[in-house]
Amino acid sequence: MNHIKSLHIEGFKKFVSLDVEFNEHMNILVGENEVGKSTILDAIKTVLNQQYRNADKSILRDLLNKQMVAAFEANPSVKTLPRILIEVELALDPKSKNADYFYGEVYGALKKQDEKFGIRFECRYDEALGAGMEQSILEGKIPYEYYNLTWMTFANNPYQMMR
């Protein structure tokens, strides 16, 4: 049965880094208020439904992890700019339609150079687009308008939500 196998989050809302493994049949998120249950669901929606695809870049203030923003402010540089990475690993039948579109080597956060099915969302500063912003960055300003939001499959294909 096709399902979400695992989730990796870096720099999204309250999570600096989080890995979640899912059960094939049923998953229940249980916890106190404000521990991140809804954030896990938002991360999945962000990847699969391309949530925020056409949103104003000012929304990034609410999406970037506050600890990562504080670390940037303490040591402002292009290398310390906060970013978001969310990877959803899928368990797909290799013979199913479009399975090859999602199958490829994983080089991202999972750091296992395995071949898996999945989709990766990345939100990061685009140095080429933001050429000339270095001084502003060194002053501790995050250039949200020069961030790119990209959705790619593990096969390095652009991901478009299937309707």
What is the predicted function of each stretch?
Residues 85, 92-163:
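Electropositive, glycine-dotted interaction segments
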Residues 38-40, 72, 119-124:
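Short C-terminal domain-edge/linker segments immediately following a structured domain
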Residues 10-12, 19, 76-80, 110-111, ...:
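Generic marker of residues within folded, mature protein domains
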Residues 1-50, 58-69:
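Pre-Walker A-like glycine/lysine-rich segment at the N-terminus of P-loop NTPase domains
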